[in-house]
Amino acid sequence: MSKLPTGVEIRGRYIRIWFMFRGKRCRETLKGWEITNSNIKKAGNLRALIVHEINSGEFEYLRRFPQSSTGAKMVTTRVIKTFGELCDIWTKIKETELTTNTMKKTKSQLKTLRIIICESTPISHIRYSDILNYRNELLHGETLYLDNPRSNKKGRTVRTVDNYIALLCSLLRFAYQSGFISTKPFEGVKKLQRNRIKPDPLSKTEFNALMESEKGQSQNLWKFAVYSGLRHGELAALAWEDVDLEKGIVNVRRNLTILDMFGPPKTNAGIRTVTLLQPALEALKEQYKLTGHHRKSEITFYHREYGRTEKQKLHFVFMPRVCNGKQKPYYSVSSLGARWNAAVKRAGIRRRNPYHTRHTFACWLLTAGANPAFIASQMGHETAQMVYEIYGMWIDDMNDEQIAMLNARLS
């Protein structure tokens, strides 16, 4: 037998090769290879190819040797082949990056994607055209609420579909960056076209009708909501510990999610100090007479940092009525929405989404000539750009009023 190629050994009845990988000498037996001159030469060629792949950063241990115990120890990330496996590993990694609330919503979205795409689908088979087909299915197909089948309906909103597809593209981008797939099917996938919805604020006449139809806490709640611009999750989570009636300010540092979990406001800019307009301050002073002396309740606050929670004892500004002898310490976001719908109906004014209390705040301040940067800071937006994007059409409609105001001030 001729001299063995570099890195090739004969061990009993088997041919074995060795190579250096990550600073360690690795040995792999070529099972099923008979000891012949031809196979020894092939083993030398295989070993040379592996060395080349290692040097060029292309070597995938478990692809070359799927059953290797050495490879299983050397490789820290397992090879992912199916969509279900991709969802599992992505979720495990993202749990340390996303807040508990965001993770819950994401897992709910993944349940739907797992059904539509099918868990056993090889991720290497997913093409650009498949993503577009999944998008159509999400847009026109039936919703898949497994916990509450009665709520299922045909179709989803464009915004919801865009969120699902953004999540899917994020998964596939992760798969590409991890070397699980060699193509980029997510490239070029665009958002569906959406019409910009023009804000529909309450008129002063409608607001007065709302105030006349409400009394007590309900009147205080909606008066404060309209004149402070807080998000409804921030309203529900507002505690007297956040309020300074002397200085006329509210420190917004807590939000209640739709999943009934307390955490920071939506963005870092959402943690802010709101300087109260006089009507908002008056509403809080009246509300203090109703709930300012209630006992504190303990809640769990979920920080953005993974795994960090905090117990907080608070007495909330707005509290539900006693029901069946029990007093819940705060409103849920959905119950605030229900109270808004009931109040609008009692007032006999046109129905709007509850979020329009916030739109009304912004539009009224713009009409009064407030600086968009100031409005953005009060509402918890990162920059004034958000105000221009959301209320741009409203601002354009105010041009004539702005000219009249400038003429009056400059004359």
UniProtKB/Swiss-Prot annotation:
Keywords: DNA integration, DNA recombination, DNA-binding, Viral genome integration, Virus entry into host cell. Pfam families: Arm-DNA-bind_2, Phage_integrase. Gene3D superfamilies: 1.10.150.130, Intergrase catalytic core (1.10.443.10). Residues 197-404 form the Tyr recombinase domain. InterPro entries: CB, DNA_brk_join_enz, Integrase-like_cat_sf, Integrase_catalytic, Integrase_recombinase_N, Min27-like_integrase_DNA_bind, Tyrosine_recombinase_XerCD. The keyword tRNA-binding does not apply. Residues 81-176 form the Core-binding (CB) domain. PROSITE patterns: CB, TYR_RECOMBINASE. GO terms for molecular function: DNA binding; site-specific recombinase activity. Transmembrane segments: none annotated. GO terms for biological process: chromosome segregation; DNA recombination; establishment of integrated proviral latency; symbiont entry into host cell; viral genome integration into host DNA. The keyword Hydrolase does not apply. Belongs to the 'phage' integrase family. This is Prophage integrase IntR. The gene is intR.
